């Protein structure tokens, strides 16, 4: 199986690796895993007062496709509203990275991580 140039680029030069303080009320965190392959993905978003994602970070333990999916998604969500970020689908990620069918689950993880981070952010805001 050969990886696409985009997967290789995001794997060798991942964007936005790291984490934010989870106690920050403007940060939403999503942690998801895939029992099928052991990949674990943590994705965090930082949202400004206007409801726009101003920054994103990730830490992923997994294959090149999982790391590339995380890296790509953190780039995509920056500058988007929560609704726009929520609308990102795994098929968009898989298509952009040209993932082979056996690696589609990596793009599903990335979509799930975005949704989990948004849900976490919203639950923090509602708790105020």
Curated annotation (Swiss-Prot):
GO terms for biological process: intracellular iron ion homeostasis; iron-sulfur cluster assembly; L-cysteine catabolic process. It holds the Pfam family NifU_N. A scaffold on which IscS assembles Fe-S clusters. Exists as 2 interconverting forms, a structured (S) and disordered (D) form. The D-state is the preferred substrate for IscS. Converts to the S-state when an Fe-S cluster is assembled, which helps it dissociate from IscS to transfer the Fe-S to an acceptor. It is likely that Fe-S cluster coordination is flexible as the role of this complex is to build and then hand off Fe-S clusters. This is Iron-sulfur cluster assembly scaffold protein IscU. InterPro entries: ISCU (IPR011339), NIF_FeS_clus_asmbl_NifU_N (IPR002871). One of its GO terms (cellular component) is cytosol. Changing residue 111 to A: Stabilizes apo-protein in the S-state; biphasic Fe-S cluster assembly 7-fold slower than wild-type. Belongs to the NifU family. The lineage of its organism: Bacteria, Pseudomonadati, Pseudomonadota, Gammaproteobacteria, Enterobacterales. Carboxymethylation by iodoacetic acid blocks sulfur transfer to this protein. It comes from Escherichia coli (strain K12). Changing residue 90 to D: Stabilizes apo-protein in the D-state; Fe-S cluster assembly 3-fold slower than wild-type. Changing residue 89 to A: Stabilizes apo-protein in the D-state; Fe-S cluster assembly 3-fold slower than wild-type. Homodimer. Forms a heterotetramer with IscS; each subunit of the IscS dimer contacts an IscU monomer. Transmembrane segments: none annotated. PANTHER family: IRON-SULFUR CLUSTER ASSEMBLY ENZYME NIFU HOMOLOG (PTHR10093). GO terms for molecular function: 2 iron, 2 sulfur cluster binding; 4 iron, 4 sulfur cluster binding; copper ion binding; ferrous iron binding; identical protein binding; zinc ion binding.
């Amino acid at each position: 199986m050969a990886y696409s140039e985009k997967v290789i680029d995001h794997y060798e030069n991942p964007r936005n690796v790291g984490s934010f303080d989870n106690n920050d009320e403007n940060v939403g965190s999503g942690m998801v895993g895939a029992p099928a392959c052991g990949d674990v993905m943590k994705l965090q978003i930082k949202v400004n007062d206007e409801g726009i994602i101003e920054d994103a970070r990730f830490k992923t333990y997994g294959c090149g496709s999982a790391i590339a999916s995380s890296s790509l998604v953190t780039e995509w969500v920056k500058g988007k509203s929560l609704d726009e970020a929520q609308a990102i689908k795994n098929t968009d990620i898989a298509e952009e990275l040209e993932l082979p069918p056996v690696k589609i689950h990596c793009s599903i993880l990335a979509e799930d991580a975005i949704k989990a981070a948004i849900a976490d952010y919203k639950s923090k805001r509602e708790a105020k």
